[in-house]
Regions:
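Extracellular/periplasm-exposed beta-strand and loop segments of Gram-negative cell-envelope proteins
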Residues: 3-36, 66-107, 139-149, 153, ...
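Residues on the lipid-exposed face of transmembrane beta-strands in outer-membrane beta-barrel proteins
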Residues: 40-46, 59-61, 112-118, 128, ...
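Internal, hydrophobic beta-strand segments that form the core of beta-sheet-rich folds
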Residues: 126-132
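Outer-envelope beta-barrel architecture signal
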Residues: 51-57, 106, 122-124, 178-180
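Amphipathic alpha-helical interface segments within eukaryotic helical scaffold
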Residues: 4-6, 29-31, 38-58
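Transmembrane beta-barrel architecture of outer-membrane proteins
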Residues: 38, 108-110, 132, 178
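Outer-membrane beta-barrel "beta-signal"
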Residues: 173-188
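Transmembrane beta-strands of outer-membrane beta-barrel pores
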Residues: 1-4, 61-69, 132-136, 188
Length: 188
């Protein structure tokens, strides 16, 4: 299994330094999580037939590890009214104090599915089904954003007092996916 989340935040503002001059600031934050499941899977498929109808039930269970890779990047560009441009590390919520990390955690996943099909004639079948997957341990991108920011970091500054914020703490949650499928099969 693999699940990827991405979020980008861009901010642009202008500050007046007098009657006609403006300084422009542009900040960009990028947040990305990539979850990959590695493990063993056990499952069973059972299929029943009755006349032209058939019903298939699928059940799977997997134990293993989820590797959660989190990348947080930010940059600020300042342009003065004289046209001088400077670039600094860190945007607004993405600062040098929270670059993200990679961690592997114990996880389990399960899948359930049911499919019914009907034989219109011996070579042609129609099917419809439902599937559900649950994954116990994933990192979602919005859970990794720390809204607390020490403003000393803005514009490339360093923290001389106060907390090292934003900080990175990996938060995980469960993930549920559902789907409906339809099929058309012709055998020749």
């Amino acid at each position: 299994l693999m699940l990827e989340d991405q979020l980008a935040v861009n901010l642009s503002s202008s500050v007046s330094n007098g009657a006609t001059s403006f300084d422009t600031y542009t900040a960009s934050d990028s947040f990305r999580t990539l979850n990959q499941f590695y493990g063993g899977e056990f499952g069973m498929i059972e299929k029943w037939w009755r006349d032209r109808w058939s019903l298939q039930v699928l059940g799977k269970f997997a134990l293993g590890a989820t590797t959660v890779s989190t990348r947080i990047n930010g940059v600020t560009t300042a342009t003065t009214s004289a046209g001088i441009t400077s670039t600094f590390p860190g945007g607004v919520l993405a600062q040098p104090t929270n670059p993200g990390n990679e961690r592997s955690l114990f996880a389990a996943a399960g899948e359930f599915g049911v499919t019914a099909d009907y034989a219109i004639w011996s070579q042609f079948r129609l099917s419809v089904g439902y599937s559900l997957i649950y994954w116990t341990t994933v990192g979602r991108v919005t859970d990794q954003i720390d809204p607390s920011v020490n403003p000393q970091q803005f514009g490339g500054g360093t923290i001389t007092s106060g907390p090292l914020e934003p900080s990175f703490n990996l938060w995980t949650t469960g993930f549920l996916a559902q789907g409906i499928n339809a099929g058309l099969e012709y055998q020749f």
